[in-house]
């Protein structure tokens, strides 16, 4: 029983440590989602937790939305081959 508990705890830690994080980015423009209220930010948190993003928590960092616990399929800044505002 103790072994099963330890294995479960280790798997939970591995999932937490290896979760993806980064700046939320627009797939069409390659630009970060902007924000102006630094720290805890309802807008960033809502965007990060949106079903199409799948994140666990979001806040405003350096005037852009930073997301934690993202699935690997969610793109984060920078997107290879896309420069924000440059053609």
UniProtKB/Swiss-Prot annotation:
Coiled-coil boundaries: none
User: What Gene Ontology terms for biological process does this UniProt record contain?
Assistant: defense response
User: Residue limits of the LCN-type CS-alpha/beta domain?
Assistant: 20-85
Q: Propeptide at which positions? A: 85-87
Report any Pfam family annotated for this entry: Toxin_3
Keywords in alphabetical order, please: Amidation, Disulfide bond, Ion channel impairing toxin, Neurotoxin, Secreted, Signal, Toxin, Voltage-gated sodium channel impairing toxin
Q: List the disulfide bonds.
A: 31-84, 35-60, 44-65, 48-67
GO function terms (MF aspect): sodium channel inhibitor activity; toxin activity
Q: Report which superkingdom the organism of origin falls in.
A: Eukaryota
Single GO cellular component term: extracellular region
Q: Which InterPro entries match?
A: LCN-type_CS_alpha_beta_dom, Scorpion_toxin-like, Scorpion_toxin-like_sf, Scorpion_toxinL, Scorpion_toxinL/defensin
Subcellular location per UniProt equals: Secreted
Please list the tissues where expression of this protein has been recorded. Answer: Expressed by the venom gland.
Query: Which N-terminal stretch is annotated as signal sequence?
Result: 1-19
Modified residues annotated as Cysteine amide in this record: 84
**Gene3D superfamilies hit by this protein:** Knottin, scorpion toxin-like
> So what family is this one in?
Belongs to the long (4 C-C) scorpion toxin superfamily. Sodium channel inhibitor family. Beta subfamily.
Query: What does the UniProt function comment say about this protein?
Result: Beta toxins bind voltage-independently at site-4 of sodium channels (Nav) and shift the voltage of activation toward more negative potentials thereby affecting sodium channel activation and promoting spontaneous and repetitive firing.
Free-text note regarding domains? Has the structural arrangement of an alpha-helix connected to antiparallel beta-sheets by disulfide bonds (CS-alpha/beta).
Name of the protein in question: Neurotoxin Cex2
Q: What is the lineage of its organism?
A: Eukaryota, Metazoa, Ecdysozoa, Arthropoda, Chelicerata
């Amino acid at each position: 029983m103790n072994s099963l508990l330890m294995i479960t705890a280790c798997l939970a830690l591995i999932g937490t440590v290896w979760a993806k994080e980064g700046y939320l980015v627009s797939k069409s423009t390659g630009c970060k989602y902007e924000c102006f209220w630094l720290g805890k930010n309802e807008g960033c948190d809502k965007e990060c937790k949106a079903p199409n993003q799948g994140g666990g928590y979001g806040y405003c960092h350096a005037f852009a939305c930073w997301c934690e616990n993202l699935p690997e399929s969610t793109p984060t800044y920078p997107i290879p081959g896309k420069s924000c505002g440059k053609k």
